[in-house]
């Protein structure tokens, strides 16, 4: 992906999207997928994982990614507020169900994947545990080390929190399959399908020809898979592959 710097992008009109450059950071990839499906143009701005990103902080108030900046509106960093921005900018195709029960299901399960203490949050504890064991005190200098509640205790507890989320997702897909649907909610694509397609890379990454990420990511993601492999129902991976085949593009671009 061809990124702009903060200096190049900050005074431009429209949508600017700060994304983690150089690897398939799950939250960044998920945000990209939302805008891709809706065909919303944006200027990609490089955020560098594990670094201070001083210029990004000065512009947006945030060090991490993704950050959506639209015209002169406040920065948006949460998965839900980014999704709502996308829905406003391009109401069709909607990625949010119309019916309240379906919408509540989609938002709830999306938060289990993307929200604080959810699947990806817990997986990050395991990644940080791997990095701390490999790098020792050097990793403690990384600004991410103290930003997301990592501790050895939280890392140890993470698998027991991830597995029920995977179980809920797979149960949902089995129920939908029985009703004749290939999607998590209803009979059409929603944001939840896109979130899982991207977050699933943590526990079952595509091979290099589809996901040409640095080996570093495979090394820190492998322990996550090992810790929760018993909960990875094949229907979850089949669903991920279907979503990429029908709605997204490969190889991943970052």
Where are the regions a protein language model picked out?
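GST-like domain detector, emphasizing the conserved glutathione-binding G-site
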Residues: 1-140, 247, 251
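Conserved aromatic-histidine-acidic binding/catalytic patches
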Residues: 16-23, 70-74, 98, 150-161, ...
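C-terminal alpha-helix
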Residues: 85, 172, 242-246
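Short secondary-structure transition/capping segments
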Residues: 89-101, 141-152, 227-238
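A non-catalytic, amphipathic alpha-helix used as a structural packing/dimerization or gating element
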Residues: 101, 105-108, 157-164, 168, ...
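GST-like fold's C-terminal all-alpha helical module
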Residues: 115-216
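Short His-centered aromatic/hydrophobic patch
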Residues: 199-250
């Amino acid at each position: 992906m061809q990124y702009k710097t903060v200096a190049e992008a900050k005074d431009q009109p429209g949508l600017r999207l700060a994304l983690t450059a150089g690897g398939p950071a799950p939250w960044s990839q998920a945000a990209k997928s939302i805008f891709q499906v809706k065909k919303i143009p944006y200027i990609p701005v490089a955020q560098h994982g594990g670094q201070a990103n001083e210029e990004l902080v000065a512009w947006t108030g945030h060090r991490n990614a993704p950050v959506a900046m639209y015209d002169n509106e406040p920065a948006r960093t949460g998965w839900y507020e980014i999704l709502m921005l996308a829905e406003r900018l391009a109401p069709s195709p909607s990625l949010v169900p119309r019916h309240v029960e379906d919408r509540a299901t989609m938002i709830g399960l999306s938060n289990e994947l993307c929200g604080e203490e959810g699947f990806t949050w817990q997986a990050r504890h395991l990644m940080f545990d791997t990095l701390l064991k490999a790098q020792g005190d050097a990793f403690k200098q990384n600004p991410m080390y103290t930003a997301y509640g990592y501790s050895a205790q939280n890392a140890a507890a993470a698998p027991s929190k991830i597995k029920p989320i995977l179980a809920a997702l797979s149960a949902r897909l089995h129920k939908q399959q029985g009703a004749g649907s290939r999607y998590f909610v209803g009979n059409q694509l929603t944001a939840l399908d896109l979130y899982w397609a991207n977050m699933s890379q943590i526990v079952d990454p595509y091979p290099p020809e589809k996901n040409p990420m640095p080996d570093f990511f495979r090394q820190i993601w492998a322990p996550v898979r090992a810790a929760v492999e018993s909960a990875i129902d094949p229907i979850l991976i089949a669903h991920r592959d279907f979503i990429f085949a029908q709605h997204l593009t490969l190889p991943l671009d970052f």
